[in-house]
Amino acid sequence: MSALNDEQLDRAAGVLLAQACGDALGVPYEGRPPGAVDGPPVMKGGGLGPYEPAEWSDDTEMALCIADALCADAVPGGDVCADAVPDGDACADAGMGHGGAPDHSLVRDHALVPDHALALYDGIARRFLDWFGHESEGWARDIGIQTREVLSAAAAGEGRPAERCWRAAAEHAGGGESGAGNGALMRTGVLAIARLGDRQATAELARRVAALTHAHADVEDSSVLWTDAVQRAVLRDWSPDELLGEDHLLAGLDLLPEERRDFWERAVRESTGVEPWKIGGWGYTVTTLKAAWAAITWSQDAPDGVSGAASTGEGLRHGLEAAVRAGGDTDTVAAVAGQLLGARWGASAVPSAWRAVLHGRAPHTGGTGYEVRVAADLEVLARRIAQKGLAG
């Protein structure tokens, strides 16, 4: 595609902005039991940072590391896919799939990534490592255990940044749910707007960026499935009152390995329209995706939901509030839900009261360390990524 219309650009901007809003909305309630949040959640800060009121957390900080790399001039023409990478035949025997069984298609031979694409992955990995390295200065607070272990090992390693991260992630891969945290899913949404119109390239990008910290099939799958849903929501020609349905998320199953599609179809179907606190929002990537999806779909049909009020932006607000009520890892569940809600309703649907106070830390433009950015900065950044990366 050659251009985006105004509505698509608004939805592209909504991906990053609504993620940050969900993140900041969930921060104060992290660790609460499912369903324990009484009344509408508010951006009052605190949490595990602790964070200032209306400040986003590590979820959005890592997403902004990716966004900053996607905007870097070193990425030629936005061509971020690894076109020459074959499927599982060239992959190393590492990583785990469902139930802890080895998944030979997971950890790919990253040496096959073309140099023009490797430059982007290096840029993302370098920003992750810089983010991690400034923890003592107040950036990178509340880092997940798995992400911390991988980035710590990668920081001490040798070679190109992406190669160090991929290697460290593979070395720290664990079986079962413990090795499949939600630290990649929480940051994946922005990748959806990097190659709009090219689902295969976007899926490859989502897999490889996930693998920088999490070498697990469930993490790859969840990132691919969610990123694809976000991208299609940005590009779709929605009618004013049209809501997100089960088929929208299931449409991404064709991008997953055939042997894992049944697992994900069950996960989607059993969480559609369910009260999110019945799923919970703890750190396993599959549970997080299910909780976010439940919050989105349940809030559309709930008595206090958005039926008849879609054009007012209530769909986005109700969905994020429902995500926080899932409990557990509330900032991450709401951040993930925000990616897709923003892709459906757009940046223009974000309540002005949230937009006025939202802020947080992001990579310093043109250097190392961080700077503070606000809602308007995220919109500009997302629009730039979307326009730069249009697939030909």
Tell me what each language-model feature is.
Residues 1-392:
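Structured, active/binding-site neighborhoods that engage oxygen-rich ligands
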